Amino acid sequence: MPKVALYNINGEQVGEVELKDEVFGIEPHEHVMHEAVNMQLANQRQGTHDTKTRAEVRGGGRKPWRQKGTGRARAGSSRSPIWRKGGIVFGPHPRDYAISLPKKVRRLALKSALSSKVLDQNIIVLDSLTMDAPKTKDMVRILGNLKADKALVVTATRDLNVEKSARNIEGVKPLKADGVNVYDLLKYTKLVITKDAVAKIEEVLA
């Protein structure tokens, strides 16, 4: 079982915590993490883009000029794709970009991302993280004590004081344990996570 230091909000080590091998100690699968990130980004796409074909553009019902005798090229509609203001050929139309991955693959990707944080020594476990009131300055000080500037801050449950204190800091994102995902774990250098949040993640993934 990997052991990591346990810190308080002043950046002082107050002990050690053992992490479960099956969640934080596996060999990271880069390809699986890549697939999970692709899925997450694809599923965020709205897919509402649309262009009008020659059948949908307004006008163009009348033949611009007669077929023969004018010396000009043949034309059947002023909304032909080769004309100005004509319809669009092969343009985008509304579609669903959603990608699905098997549950086992999604879990493996999440375990891989968590394990990579341990391997790279980019995980900081806190004994607790509570704030009396939302104050960005206090959160900046806490993260400064922990030497974690670009960080994903994870708590066991939603804490509005922590969330409001962290959300306006550039390069910092607050999350609750059940919202942890591969994309954010890879995007942010440090994972600042409470001991309770670790237990909650292990309970779900172990």
Swiss-Prot record:
Similarity-based family? Belongs to the universal ribosomal protein uL4 family.
The record's listing under Gene3D superfamilies reads: 3.40.1370.10
List the biased-composition ranges (Basic residues).
60-71
Q: Where is the composition biased (Basic and acidic residues)?
A: 47-59
Q: What does this protein do?
A: One of the primary rRNA binding proteins, this protein initially binds near the 5'-end of the 23S rRNA. It is important during the early stages of 50S assembly. It makes multiple contacts with different domains of the 23S rRNA in the assembled 50S subunit and ribosome. Forms part of the polypeptide exit tunnel.
Q: Quote the gene name from the UniProt entry.
A: rplD
MF terms from GO for this chain are: rRNA binding; structural constituent of ribosome
Q: Listed GO cellular component terms?
A: ribonucleoprotein complex; ribosome
Matches recorded under HAMAP family: Ribosomal_uL4_B
SUBUNIT field:
Part of the 50S ribosomal subunit.
Identify the keywords attached in UniProt to this record, alphabetized: Ribonucleoprotein, Ribosomal protein, RNA-binding, rRNA-binding
Q: Can you name this protein?
A: Large ribosomal subunit protein uL4
A GO BP annotation: translation
The record, for InterPro entries, names: Ribosomal_uL4, Ribosomal_uL4-like, Ribosomal_uL4_dom_sf
One family from Pfam that matches here is Ribosomal_L4
- Annotated signal sequence is none
Cite the residue spans of the region called Disordered. Answer: 43-78
